[in-house]
Amino acid sequence: MKQLLDFLPLVVFFVFYKMYDIFVASGALIVATLLALAFTWFKYRKVEKMTLVTAIMVLVFGTLTLAFHSDLFIKWKVTVLYVLFAVALLVSQWFMKKPLIQRMLGKELTLPDTVWSTLNMSWAVFFLVCGLLNIYVAFWLPQDIWVNFKVFGLTALTLVFTLISGVYIYRHMPEEQKKS
């Protein structure tokens, strides 16, 4: 349910873009994000940090897009968000006792420290690559292609990378955890 709520504003953005334009879609994205955030808070009494950061980025970059009537801001939001995620992962890798991925999943999974480090670095690189891909698609290709890439391309890449990470985790899980 939470994943659907996180994905819903993106669907709203896509639909409003196809029906109207990037500016109406950006406004709809802001509203949908705020509604999803409010619903999440009232239903679960908790909002994940990544969800909150994403919502703040949508509010800031969406508002700038509307205020300056420039699609540059909403296009940059994707890259800035991915770079922030990558930086958070890298900072946790280099300056904290546990990588961020381990702090997020470590209660459910028992894995060797090297596996946590590899996962953490892999996701950091993934986010950096996605941020760079977004720059290329957003600024060198037509807006329609960028919207499709943002909604379908990045979502598909994230899903595939999540599955690859799941396989990697499974291969390194203790046997007793694999059975449960």
From Swiss-Prot:
The keyword Transmembrane helix applies. It is found in: Cell inner membrane. InterPro entries: YciB (IPR006008). Keywords: Cell inner membrane, Cell membrane, Membrane, Transmembrane, Transmembrane helix. The keyword NADP does not apply. Disulfide bonds: none annotated. GO terms for cellular component: plasma membrane. Pfam families: IspA. It is a multi-pass membrane protein. It comes from the Bacteria. The chain crosses the membrane at residues 22-42, 50-70, 72-92, 121-141, 149-169. HAMAP family: YciB. Plays a role in cell envelope biogenesis, maintenance of cell envelope integrity and membrane homeostasis. Belongs to the YciB family. This is Inner membrane-spanning protein YciB. It comes from Yersinia enterocolitica serotype O:8 / biotype 1B (strain NCTC 13174 / 8081). The gene is yciB.
